[in-house]
Amino acid sequence: ARVSNGALPCGTVDMKAASCISFATGKDKKPSAACCSGLHPLAQTVKTVEDNKAICRCLKTAIKNFSRVQDRFLGQIPTPCKIKGRLPCFHKHRLRKAPLRCIGLETDGFESSPLGMC
């Protein structure tokens, strides 16, 4: 089993975000209530930069299984779901294309990458 090395195992992260796939692939016009209600508790677990990086790594790995997921849709999820700053990987990063080392390093409300790598 994949482990996030953060507050939650990747299986839990994946399960909470699974309802967002229809929107992330462009099938639905807006994130479903189930998508938003899954992401809210996930966002609340983010307390540190490490928590954010771990969750974003899980999400990045999981979306590789869905070829139609588009970054432009992922980036739109926080607004209709009213998630502010706690899942920055949706706000700032292109999950499909960002190297894993960059996920979660430069984020809203968290410290920037100490090495300026991303």
UniProtKB/Swiss-Prot annotation:
Pfam family of the protein (one): Tryp_alpha_amyl
GO molecular function: lipid binding
Keywords: Lipid-binding, Signal, Transport
Tissue: Highly expressed in haustorially induced seedlings and absent in germinated seedlings.
Tagged with keyword Signal: yes
Entry annotated with the keyword Signal: yes
Listed GO biological process terms: lipid transport
Leader peptide range in chain numbering: 1-7
Domain of life: Eukaryota
Family membership: Belongs to the plant LTP family.
Function: Plant non-specific lipid-transfer proteins transfer phospholipids as well as galactolipids across membranes. May play a role in wax or cutin deposition in the cell walls of expanding epidermal cells and certain secretory tissues.
PANTHER family: NON-SPECIFIC LIPID-TRANSFER PROTEIN 2-RELATED (PTHR33076)
Protein name as annotated: Non-specific lipid-transfer protein
